């Protein structure tokens, strides 16, 4: 799965530190809220580039779009919470890995120009994702 790393603003990190013992129960909710925003932006960007500006008619089956997903928020051995948003490890009906299709669209190949959709999803969705995460966090801090 593709890896996206975002640095969080200092005021957001201060709010997180106020949670104390509740942090481990709130962190997955906060990460999933931000992940949903990025996933939505990825779907939008992917739909806008698949089959556009090609020499031949598109033969898209929708397998790549269907493989987009989000892992549950999990804590690693260092105690850090992570969530992954992107293309899964599955293959289409012909055995072609969807990650390969995503890479070819993102970076292009000989005779096929790049159509970046993943990187732009991260940059376009970043502010919305952080706002969504803040909203969930504030909802958890108030009660």
Would you name each region that the model predicts?
Residues 1-84, 90-94, 98-143:
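Short, Lys/Arg-rich flexible segments
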């Amino acid at each position: 799965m593709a890896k996206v790393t975002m640095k969080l603003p200092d005021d957001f990190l201060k709010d997180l530190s106020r949670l104390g013992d509740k942090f481990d129960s709130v962190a997955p909710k906060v990460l999933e809220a931000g992940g949903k925003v990025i996933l939505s932006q990825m779907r939008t960007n992917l739909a806008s580039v698949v089959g556009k500006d090609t020499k031949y008619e598109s033969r898209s089956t929708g397998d790549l779009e269907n493989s987009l997903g989000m892992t549950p928020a999990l804590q690693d051995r260092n105690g850090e919470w992570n969530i992954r948003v992107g293309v899964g490890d599955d293959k289409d009906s012909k055995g072609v890995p969807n990650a390969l299709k995503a890479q070819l669209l993102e970076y292009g190949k000989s005779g096929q120009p790049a159509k970046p959709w993943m990187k732009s999803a991260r940059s376009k969705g970043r502010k919305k994702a952080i706002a969504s995460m803040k909203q969930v966090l504030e909802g958890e801090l108030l009660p």
